[in-house]
Amino acid sequence: FDGKPILPEAATPKTANLTRIAYGEHPHLTVHYYSPQEWQEIEDDAKGSSDSPRARVAKDLVSMVQHHGIDAATLLAGGQEEVFAVGSVDELMGKLNDYVGENGCFTALVKSTEILLPLPELQGFEIIDTPGMNDPVPSRTQKTRDYMARCDVVFFLSRCSQFLDQSDMDLLAEQLPAKGVKRMVLVAGQLDGAIADDGFDRASLAETEKNVRTRLPRRAENEIEKLAIAREKLGDPKIAELL
């Protein structure tokens, strides 16, 4: 925003907290923690022998809390919300790293955050950065669904190297809400990964990039068309029209 990054960048699910960004006259941060019951469920998942994504993320979260020496039960019993009024965007970013940064002291215990910024371009808009619909933490997934049902536009990110694979298509088929969303934008991320996979037998980087930029839109058109037809047959005309 205004040429500055606000949210930390990371590819690991443990840092993917749901964040709402909106306009405010002064920089403001609200942190929402897991409830004691939600955290107990995460601890129970971490104790099991399963190697599922949900169990792996739970173990990572519990390990982070132990690493920072935090008494999770005491902290969460003190309330599920903490509010910080800060003097500048830079100060907000420094504070934010403690709660959503990859190595933040309290990152593992945070379910979602709300950020208010004094930026005129945000007036009348809300931006929701979500962990995605396949988030291994169930309570975050439900909150993502709730927000999506109120959004006008959804940006769906998919890695170029696995662009719209079966996992992505299953998510679109099963989780896209039938109300609220008026437009969906596909975003192909991590282009360098696709170039590395595609360029081993091509003469130049330019040729590789051209092929990737041609191949991905073609795949998107074909896969989305098939999904739209399937949703129409299942009696979901609104979803079919959105796609």
Feature names for model-found ranges:
Residues F1-L243:
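Globular "head" domains of long coiled-coil molecular machines
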